[in-house]
Amino acid sequence: MFKADLFKGKRFLVTGGGTGLGRMMMEKFVELGADCVICGRRGGVLEETAKEVMAKYPGRRVETHAVDIRVATAVEEMIEKIWATRPLDGLVNNAAGNFISQTKDLSPRAFDAIANIVLHGTFYMTNACGKRWIAEKRKASVLSILTTWVWTGSPFVVPSAMSKAGVAVMTQSLAVEWARHGIRLNAIAPGPFPTEGAWARLNPMKEGDDDRYKVRNPLGRVGRPSELANMAAFLMSDEVEYINGEVIAIDGAMGIMGNGTFSSMMAYSDDDWRRIREQIQSTNAADRAKRS
């Protein structure tokens, strides 16, 4: 589908690039000739991913940085270290946090836990890279991973929907503001793409697994991670420089059909939601144990 050396000489940073869709995109960039930097909160996971990918693609470099992108000073320090080695040519804002909950049960801390990653962290990353590209007169590309909720909203994931919508507006705003500097900003809005980390918090009861998404999707299935990786490679390529300020859905037309991702949960009882909270708390505890 792509030239084997499409990204030869390029260096991209993928936030949340150690697992799931972030890893899939990073691997695709490396496959096509790029060197990559991945960051996240679990240093051990990042290092293991980097080793595996570099073993698979000899001669390519995957650098890791353990960082909490919610902390602006930590982001600035990381970007400074990355730049000291070699400037970046692109950024993929993939890091996110989310879980399902009745909005009435959300505490301010729970809301901030999502908004600080998805909205604040994405801005910190984008601005830290953008100001350096502008100062150096370097062309670059930013790609943010959103969701179709930015157009429709979604029940039970209000902090994420609000934050992702903010990133969509940031994408469109900076696409105009930074275009004269040769910096493009685009975004992908995926439908259901099952990954282990996200699905444990968004489908904790695992009732029917992803069947409920299949029956409500015109294509009759969920997304394949390779499809998202191919879309990311396309948008990061210099071959499509005229695409700027776009938010592109990749959801099998599920959004057009009018099926909100979590609308079926309207029938859940308070007991169902209690079990969901307990399962998510268990998943979060296991995740925290893996952080460096």
Question: What are these model-derived regions, one by one?
Answer:
Residues 106, 153-161, 173, 198-201:
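Active-site loop-to-helix junction immediately N-terminal to the catalytic Tyr of the SDR YXXXK motif
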Residues 131, 176-180, 241:
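Alpha-helical segment proximal to the catalytic Tyr-Lys
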Residues 102-103, 107-115, 213:
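Substrate-binding pocket helix/loop in short-chain dehydrogenase/reductase
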Residues 126, 163, 171:
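Active-site helix of classical SDR
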Residues 221-250, 255:
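C-terminal substrate-recognition "lid" of short-chain dehydrogenase/reductases
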Residues 92, 179, 184, 243-245:
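Short, small/polar-rich loop/turn modules that mediate ligand/substrate recognition or access, typified
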Residues 11, 16-19:
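Conserved glycine-rich cofactor-binding loop
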